[in-house]
């Protein structure tokens, strides 16, 4: 109910504040503006001053959405959804920063906890598959990749059983918007994604499911693109960082 939701929101805000991040609870109209931005930025925020509270939901919803095989159009703006099909085996801190900062995109990360018993069972199966792949592979590169994956899974299995580690199913979608009337807008975004060793899927024929999964909601319809990531690796995503020095001639104080 509404009271439980309010208490949960206050508790979450309190936990975030402990990390040194300031929070603000949005009002109805501020929330409506935020949700409308999740579909497109081609609107005037000042419109909301004339909107009554009982018409906010209708104002947030797109007027017209047309889907094609590998793209869609929302209120006249061309867009396309990508899903991350594969992740790099080794990542650095803030590994999500470059992906979340691609211009003219919306990035949504869905996270769902996995039961510990099911997680251990899944990892056992994956280790067995990687051992078989390593033995049967005729290419050195594939065998090396399988060995690296197996070592990673062994380390994860150990941490799940002996430490306070958990497994989470993650779906990462990137929506590219053609705000600049660029015919190559999808290629530019795809290239930026691949720079970080992520493997994007064009979701050919799955743009409706991609649109649903990229909405600000707990719904994720791209089950085939869920990937299990351990909690400590996921915590290192840090999407809200700057990837460059802000001051001209600034002095670097250190790194971790």
Describe each model-derived feature in a short phrase.
Residues 248-256:
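Glycine-rich phosphate-binding loop of nucleotide-binding enzymes
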Residues 1-238:
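Extended, folded cores of ATP/NTP-driven motor/assembly subunits in large transport
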């Amino acid at each position: 109910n509404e009271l439980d939701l309010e208490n949960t929101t206050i508790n979450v805000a309190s936990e975030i504040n402990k990390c040194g991040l300031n929070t603000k609870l949005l009002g109805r109209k501020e929330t409506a503006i935020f949700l409308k931005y999740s579909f497109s930025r081609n609107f005037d925020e000042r419109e909301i001053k004339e909107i009554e509270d009982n018409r906010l939901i209708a104002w947030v919803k797109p007027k017209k959405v047309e889907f094609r095989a590998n793209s869609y159009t929302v209120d006249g703006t061309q867009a396309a959804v990508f899903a991350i099909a594969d992740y790099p085996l080794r990542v650095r801190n803030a590994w999500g920063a470059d992906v979340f900062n691609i211009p003219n995109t919306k990035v949504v990360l869905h996270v769902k906890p996995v039961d510990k018993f099911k997680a251990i069972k899944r990892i056992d199966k994956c280790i067995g598959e990687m051992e078989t792949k390593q033995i049967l592979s005729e290419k050195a590169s594939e065998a090396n990749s399988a060995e690296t994956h197996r070592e990673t899974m062994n380390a994860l299995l150990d941490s799940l059983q002996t430490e306070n580690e958990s497994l989470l199913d993650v779906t990462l979608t990137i929506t590219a918007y053609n705000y600049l009337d660029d015919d190559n807008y999808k290629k530019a975004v795809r290239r930026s994604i691949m720079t970080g060793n992520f493997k994007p899927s064009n979701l050919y024929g799955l743009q409706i499911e991609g649109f649903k999964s990229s909405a600000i909601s707990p719904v994720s319809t791209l089950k085939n693109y869920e990937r299990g990531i351990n909690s400590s690796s996921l915590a290192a995503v840090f999407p809200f960082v700057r990837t460059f020095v802000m001051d001209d001639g600034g002095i670097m104080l250190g790194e971790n």
